[in-house]
Amino acid sequence: MSCPVIELTQQLIRRPSLSPDDAGCQALLIERLQAIGFTVERMDFADTQNFWAWRGQGETLAFAGHTDVVPPGDADRWINPPFEPTIRDGMLFGRGAADMKGSLAAMVVAAERFVAQHPNHTGRLAFLITSDEEASAHNGTVKVVEALMARNERLDYCLVGEPSSIEVVGDVVKNGRRGSLTCNLTIHGVQGHVAYPHLADNPVHRAAPFINELVAIEWDQGNEFFPATSMQIANIQAGTGSNNVIPGELFVQFNFRFSTELTDEMIKAQVLALLEKHQLRYTVDWWLSGQPFLTARGKLVDAVVNAVEHYNEIKPQLLTTGGTSDGRFIARMGAQVVELGPVNATIHKINECVNAADLQLLARMYQRIMEQLVA
């Protein structure tokens, strides 16, 4: 017996949509949505394809996701070509199966079933889809959100289909995400010969006490929703490659994943104060990729928990761990934002796969969420 969710997922996987190339995925989704009465607005920016689609009016529940995928890596290491979907032992293999073409298929099929049963639904059902989530994310969801906010679009609830689950579908639901702040720091010294250190100023030596103190800071202890803020050095570079040259500069890049106990300005102020304390000459550049956000218990969280409990008979954990997602942009609209998607064990890996039965289950969960909020 054929399954519309699996069939649509396979059609999407066959389109090699390496970010930000959509490769025809959105045209396929748009065709399905227009067939059930959705109005579709394409909102392309530069090399990125996006669309905003809606049906009905009133309180708005949007489903958000991305059609782009990361590169497959060495295709010869896959058990089948990465863009040729294959089912083995109940698992659907292919790049994007879990992140997140399976979720997109489940959303669309859920909408088709929902509209068939509730053609005159009382709320507004919407979709916000982009082809640039995995790469820079500069021209994707963030630009669509800015355009929607500029015209005062209303968005009450948003379900993001990112692969949130760990062992079984629905065991983890993300009701928030930590903020992400990156510091690109250059410590300036004076280049010279290692045999004449008095004629140079070694930025590595100067920066070492600063780095040690930075690493030792306990930024906060987190709270009931967020783990403690973490700081990790990601890159550090100095020197010419020669063993007889004192470097003139040290570059160090570090990233903060921060909770709602802090703001990005508080972090910046503490880092800058530490630099001044150690009397360093420096140039600094900050990149804030997202503020922390949290959706506390409310109508959306309750609807998602209800759907998981109904179909999988488990109570999901509400967590804010992991990386950033496009939910950070959507939360700016004042919407309640929750992430629910398939198991994430193989995302971005060789032989990415998802349990085919999980996608069928996910479509039912999505439909039940629609029924609770906009029927």
UniProtKB/Swiss-Prot annotation:
Q: Which reaction does it catalyse?
A: N-succinyl-(2S,6S)-2,6-diaminopimelate + H2O = (2S,6S)-2,6-diaminopimelate + succinate
The record ties this protein, via Pfam families, to: M20_dimer (PF07687), Peptidase_M20 (PF01546)
Amino acids binding Zn(2+) 2: 99, 134, 348
PROSITE patterns, sorted: ARGE_DAPE_CPG2_1, ARGE_DAPE_CPG2_2
Q: Which cysteine-cysteine pairs are annotated as disulfide bonds in the entry? A: none
**Leading EC class:** hydrolase
Protein's job: Catalyzes the hydrolysis of N-succinyl-L,L-diaminopimelic acid (SDAP), forming succinate and LL-2,6-diaminopimelate (DAP), an intermediate involved in the bacterial biosynthesis of lysine and meso-diaminopimelic acid, an essential component of bacterial cell walls.
Q: Which organism is it from?
A: Escherichia coli O1:K1 / APEC
Keyword GTP-binding in annotation: no
Task: Please give the Gene Ontology molecular function terms for this protein.
Answer: acetylornithine deacetylase activity; cobalt ion binding; succinyl-diaminopimelate desuccinylase activity; zinc ion binding
User: Which gene codes for it?
Assistant: dapE
Keyword list (alphabetical) reads: Amino-acid biosynthesis, Cobalt, Diaminopimelate biosynthesis, Hydrolase, Lysine biosynthesis, Metal-binding, Zinc
Entry protein name: Succinyl-diaminopimelate desuccinylase
Name the residues that bind Zn(2+) 1: 66, 99, 162
Enumerate the Gene3D superfamilies for this protein: Zn peptidases
Q: In which pathway does it act?
A: Amino-acid biosynthesis; L-lysine biosynthesis via DAP pathway; LL-2,6-diaminopimelate from (S)-tetrahydrodipicolinate (succinylase route): step 3/3
